[in-house]
Amino acid sequence: MGAAGDVTGYDMPPLMLTPDEIEAAVLGAQWVAGRGDPVLAKAARDLISKIASAVPERLRPYVLEPATGAPPAWTTAPDGLDIARTRAWIHAGRKIRLDYRDERGTVSQRVIWPVTVGYRETVRMLIGWCELRQAFRTFRTDRVVEAEFLDERHGQRPGQLRTRWQKHLEAEHAAWKAQTP
């Protein structure tokens, strides 16, 4: 069973990729291999191997000797929760209870409806609807003290929740632009 809990894989129809598309896929996979959670990082390395074995010989240098590269993130902070399981809960539309330590060291308990896991250069972020604050919030995964993966569903399809979050981001950005000279 895959990380999402319901899909293990499938046979992808043949794709005709340009050299630029191959390099883009490899670059993205390199970045994830260096910064993703262990399950996603392994999947990214496997993807590069699959691309290398599937492309014609004349295109293999774009995979094995690309002109672009993503250096590994040597200082990624350790996560306080299982990110692969978090991704599965996002797909399933289930809630997560967090004991979360803020930047001042204060610990609070939050129940969130997880939306997405975001990646910064050295830290991962969990974005979710916070029941306590009744708003979308961003939680650094290295500040999670404890996580309980609840069986309770939050009642929205993951795509609907993500759309709400994206609209929230757009509104925040518009408000910021209106205040910026």
Which stretches of residues belong to each language-model region?
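Short glycine- and basic-residue-enriched patches
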Residues: 1-181
